[in-house]
Structure formats: structure tokens, C-alpha cells
């Protein structure tokens, strides 16, 4: 087990680091309200929405956490040419990120919409295009990430299997970071660990590790 003092030192060091994060962004919508009746149209609860919250999730959550710990974060990701993608761009501004998402006109921005009554989640609806990037967009990701990594101290690859981190992008970025002597940390949702060959650290949770072995 890592000593607490070492963890504190590592977190403190983040305040002076620049981190390049590349990966899948999602738009997380939360609709909070109350349930007082069942719909006459179907046997489902009717949520009276009282409050709505939006934030960037998936790799965006990694970036938000890095910023919260004092790091200077850069973010390379892809959204669709839709209202959700526009909202992600505005949330980038709220986080004071100097980056803007790459826009793929053939792609739908990954969005998760949750309806919550009290402490109970009633429903989650997903919109996404979980397929690999076309070569043109893939190359834009590689080129932008290469430029950003040159200004950073480390590389975080946040792979939620939505297509941004292709095999080619992973191989080129991990190789580039290694040549530059910069550590590579992988945050993943999946079981294909061979794709991250050359990374310094992979961070599965217990279930993901069990699935992989």
C-alpha cells in the first residue's frame, strides 16, 4: 500500500504540473425533481423537474479533477456538430480551458441524461456514436495532442470506448510521450489492455481488472 505521506506529496505536486488529457468527453445532464404521481399514459412515474445541472463527464471528469487538484490541464477531444457539442464548448470556457473540442460533423456528442427524484435515479437516457473516428478526424486528434503534449509534463489517456482513442492514436501518442520522457497514465473502461502497451500506469477499478483477467 502506498503511504499516505507519498499520496499527499503526489497530489501537492500536481499544483505545479501541466497535464495533457486526450480522450472521450461526454455531456452529463442531471434533472432533479420530485415524483408525486404515476403517468396516465403508462405505468411510469412523472418527474416534476425543479433543477437542471450540466457538466463534462468521462474524460471531462478527469480534467475537472485535475483542475480541482491545482494542475494546469489541457484537453484534446471530439464532439459532434450539435447542441450538446456546443454546450460542451461552453463548459470548456467555464473551466477556463484554452482548448476547444474538435468537431466531427458525422458524429453525435456523447450525452447521458439522468432524471433523479430525491436520492433515487429514475431514468438514464444515452445519446452517442460509439465508433472509431474517420481518418481525417483521427489525424486532427493526433496532431493537436502532439502539439499540446509538447507543452505538458505528462499524458493522461482517458478511454471510455467511444472512439476518440483509436489504435493508431494510442500507439503514436504513447510512443511520443516515451521518447520525451513523459509519464503516460491510462484511465480506461474496457478490457483490451494490450492497446496501451508502453504506458506507465493503468488505473482499472476492481471490476474492470477482474473482467480483464
Residue positions per predicted region:
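Active-site gating loops and adjacent loop-to-helix segments of metal-dependent hydrolytic enzymes
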Residues: 42-45
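Ribokinase/PfkB-type carbohydrate-kinase core domain
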Residues: 1-36, 48-213
Amino acid at each position: 500500500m502506498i503511504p499516505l505521506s507519498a499520496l499527499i506529496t503526489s497530489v501537492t505536486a500536481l499544483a505545479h504540473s501541466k497535464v495533457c488529457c486526450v480522450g472521450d468527453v461526454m455531456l452529463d445532464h442531471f434533472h432533479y425533481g420530485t415524483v408525486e404521481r404515476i403517468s396516465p399514459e403508462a405505468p411510469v412515474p412523472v418527474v416534476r423537474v425543479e433543477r437542471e445541472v450540466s457538466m463534462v463527464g468521462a474524460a471531462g471528469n478527469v480534467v475537472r479533477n485535475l483542475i480541482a487538484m491545482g494542475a494546469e490541464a489541457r484537453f484534446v477531444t471530439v464532439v459532434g456538430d450539435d447542441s450538446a457539442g456546443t454546450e460542451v464548448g461552453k463548459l470548456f470556457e467555464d473551466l477556463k480551458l484554452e482548448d476547444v473540442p474538435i468537431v466531427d460533423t458525422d458524429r453525435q456528442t456523447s450525452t447521458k441524461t439522468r432524471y433523479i427524484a430525491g436520492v433515487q435515479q429514475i431514468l438514464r437516457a444515452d445519446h452517442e456514436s460509439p465508433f472509431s473516428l474517420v481518418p481525417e478526424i483521427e489525424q486532427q486528434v493526433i496532431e493537436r495532442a502532439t502539439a499540446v503534449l509538447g507543452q505538458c509534463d505528462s499524458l493522461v489517456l482517458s478511454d471510455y470506448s467511444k472512439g476518440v482513442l483509436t489504435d493508431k492514436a494510442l500507439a503514436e501518442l504513447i510512443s511520443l510521450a516515451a521518447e520525451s520522457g513523459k509519464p503516460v497514465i491510462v484511465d480506461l473502461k474496457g478490457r483490451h489492455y494490450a492497446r496501451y502497451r508502453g504506458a506507465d500506469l493503468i488505473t482499472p477499478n476492481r471490476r474492470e481488472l477482474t473482467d480483464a483477467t
